[in-house]
Each structure stands twice: as C-alpha cells, then as structure tokens.
Amino acid sequence: MAEAEAGGDDGRCVRLNAERAQALLADVDTLLFDCDGVLWRGETAVPGAPETLTALRARGKRLAFITNNSSKTREAYAEKLRCLGFGAPAGPDAGREVFGTAYCTALYLRQRLTGPPAPKAYVLGSVALAAELEAVGVSCVGVGPEPLLGDGPGAWLDAPLEPDVRAVVVGFDPHFSYMKLTKAVRYLQQPDCLLVGTNMDNRLPLENGRFIAGTGCLVRAVEMAAQRQADIIGKPSRFIFDCVSQEYGIHPERTVMVGDRLDTDILLGVTCGLKTILTLTGVSSLRDVKSNQESDCMAKKKMVPDFYVDSIADLLPALQG
C-alpha cells in the first residue's frame, strides 16, 4: 500500500521518513518498544534493529521494553536483549528496562491479595510466570503438565484441589489441558477468587510468517467455562503502562510507543496519550490501518498510529544524520 493510501484525513499514519523522524525524536525522551515482531521474530533479531537501539541509546534516549509475553522473567528478557545485540543492562540492574506481563501480573497480585490467608495462585502458565509471582510472595501451584485423572467427568471433578487458592492466573501455557481448565473453573467457583489474564493476544508471530496460538485463546477458554471476565494485565490495559510510568516517571507527551499490533501496542499508546509508531515487521498491516480508518466503529478508529515504518531500522538515517 502506498504512503498516500495509508494516511487518513486526520493526518495520522504517515510514513516516518528521516525528516519526520528527526523532528519526532527531538521532542521525545522515552521510547517504549514491544519485542516480538518489532525487535525480533522468534530467536532472530529484525535486521537493523540492534543498531537502531544502539543509536537511540547514544542519543541519550530512555528505552523500555513492554511485552505481553509471559514466558520469561525480566532477567531472562534482558539476557535475550543482550544476546541479540540490543545492549540491555547486566548485573544487579538486569531487567530494569523490561516490563513483561509476568512481572506486572506479580505487581497486580501483590496489590490485590492483601491480608490473610497467605496469597496463593493456581497458575496456567510458565515457570517464569510463577517465579515472578513467588518473588513478590505469591505461592504458586499448577505449573507444568497436568493430565486427566480418572476415566470420566465425575473423576475429573473429584481431583483434589489446593486449599486457599485466591487467584487463577492464565498466561502462555504450552501444557494447557482439559484437566487444568476444569481445575481453574472449580477454583473460580469461589466468588473471592480472582481471575487474571496476562494478555489477550490471539497469536504470537515467529520467523518466516509463521505464528502460534496466543495467550488470549487460553484466557477466553477459562472465561467462557467459568462465566467470569478476567482482569487483563498486558497491553492495551493501562495497568502495564502505569507500571512503567511509576518506575520511569514518564511524561506521556514526550514518549513514543513502538509496536506491531494495532489492537495492543497502538491502542495502548493512544489510550495513554503517547505518540505511536507502527512497524510492519509483525502482525498488523497498512491494510488493517486503512480498514480501521474507514470503519464506522469509534473503537477501531482509535487503533490508528501517528506514523508507520517498514521496520524500526528505518529510524537509522535520522539517527545517523
């Protein structure tokens, strides 16, 4: 789609050429980056992305990484950033730039699960998610494979439950199973038991245009079975931005959100009053933007970025000039 086709009557979603990028960066202190589909695909860095972030750091820009992926701790994400050449801090400061949904879910539960009994969560998710929860004092059960017990529904419902579970947390879980779903619903029959989803992404992009089902598919399954609506931590929820803002002291008008998804990254930026850049190396396309611009739905009209780039490497000329 040509540049002329991308911009709407309101001047949003224009190609961020070198001249526009220089003007934008002059008014910006902080850049918030999504990771999957923006900085890398799977285990491969987007060409030119490491050099772009190195140049931004050299210009004195503050960087933070906001990911809906709950499969790694902050420290593990920092290690991946370093291994792929993005220059994240090491040592005691490792992970301080990273705001993943595992970490932010832990902050949320620490706020909500006050008082006795001691906080405990049934976790449909990764070891990393459980590690972040346990780091703030929330004990975890349920991580890992959980096959069906018995030979029918009666036996499944008789499977023992842990006492005093105060939250069901749904993240990315390759071991998601009918047994786990059944247990989650049983815990959620207690009205005071929280249902928390790390994010609602429907798919996770990998290399060569491939993708896998995202966490949102699992959250929806639990919501439907339990007839409950989950509290969502990740983008576009404002909670994850508030986590960054509290630690970084962000001024929204001098902050840019860079992402590849209109319904998470760009919507978060618009909702929080940030400047927004869509990169076309991930999920959303200019065709999606145009569809939103032409929609009669006001919610879709909000999911339009200020600028777009083919890749964040398109920022390099402005940084080298």
Curated annotation (Swiss-Prot):
Signal peptide: none annotated. This is Glycerol-3-phosphate phosphatase. It catalyses: O-phospho-L-tyrosyl-[protein] + H2O = L-tyrosyl-[protein] + phosphate; sn-glycerol 1-phosphate + H2O = glycerol + phosphate; sn-glycerol 3-phosphate + H2O = glycerol + phosphate. GO terms for molecular function: glycerol-1-phosphatase activity; glycerol-3-phosphatase activity; magnesium ion binding; phosphoglycolate phosphatase activity; protein tyrosine phosphatase activity. The keyword Metal-binding applies. Its cofactor is Mg(2+). Coiled coil: none annotated. Keywords: Carbohydrate metabolism, Hydrolase, Magnesium, Metal-binding, Protein phosphatase. It comes from Bos taurus (Bovine). InterPro entries: HAD-like_sf (IPR036412), HAD-SF_hydro_IIA (IPR006357), HAD_sf (IPR023214), PGP_euk (IPR006349). Mg(2+) binds at residues 34, 36, 260. The record marks 204 as: Important for substrate specificity. The gene is PGP. Its EC number is 3.1.3.21, 3.1.3.48.
